[in-house]
Amino acid sequence: PMTRFIAEGRAVLETARRTKQIFQIGTYGRFEQKTEMRKIIRAGFAKGREVRIIRRGGFKVGQWSGPIQIDPRPVPDYLDWEMYCGPSPLKPFHPPRFGGMHRGYWDYDGGGLTDMGQHHLDPLCFAMGKDDEHPVEITAHAPPAHPEVTGMWGWSRLAYADGVELILESGEWGKPHGLKEKGIGRGDLTEAERRQLDEIPDEDPLVGFGEAVKTRVQAGGNADTSHHSVCLMHLTNLAIRTGRTIKFDPEKEVAIGDEGANRLINQPMRAPWHL
């Protein structure tokens, strides 16, 4: 993922804006999305209609759930363990925390959800017209979370202020949510809305990184859009880890009335690292 927690992403976004540097996260599919649904939703025509997008599977939840009871081992001679841990807490070394299995520990990552999630959800953010918007209510169906090790989850529901819903479904745990996907297209609009839609000019094509460096036009998948897409995984993990529905303030980027969730939104960093 672009970041490990929400406040870290806000710092990246604000730094990119302040310095006017070209920034891009390379994810699968953003440049291949059709834009009709995006245009309809951004025009405000989703309000009052049922719009629900479901992303099924591909999150590698079981594959990247970390082992729990592993005895500490001596640090290998070739590894600077303190530097490897970086801003995360300095924990005793054991092999699963190093290399690919690091994804299964909250200290370093967010499990299979954040491992593959940004690839899957970044294009959906674009297609749904939510590149600059956060969901306001997040619910997850999962067993109680371990404090250090990522684990299984079944599904999450992320609802936006305009009523658009995104459902993430792992297919690896628990009962299904029972909800049906419902997109939105021209056929769902009134004649007057279709005329309004036709009057809205098409957006400029997304710019690749090389062209962005030359032209200084921000690339597709820039810090703003990537922060909003990675927050979908971070917010789902908040609901999983707390076991609660998260009411999220999309402007302040805080959980409303939930200090436990807010401690995960802005996590301490081990010195000398800081935001």
Task: Give names to the regions the model predicted.
Residues 3-80:
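A contiguous active-site-proximal alpha/beta segment in oxidoreductase catalytic domains
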Residues 211-275:
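C-terminal helix-rich "cap/oligomerization" subdomain common to oxidoreductases
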Residues 47-51, 92-95, 130-140, 165-168, ...:
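Acidic/polar loop patches that form or flank catalytic/metal-binding clefts of enzymes
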Residues 13, 38, 42, 85, ...:
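Non-transmembrane alpha-helical segments in soluble domains
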Residues 25-27, 71, 106-114, 139-145, ...:
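Active-site rim elements
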Residues 142-204:
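NAD(P)-dinucleotide binding in Rossmann-like oxidoreductases
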Residues 82-162:
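Rossmann-like dinucleotide-binding domain that binds NAD(P)(H)
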Residues 4, 22-27, 49-53, 83-85, ...:
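Structural recognition of the beta-strand scaffold that forms the well-ordered cores
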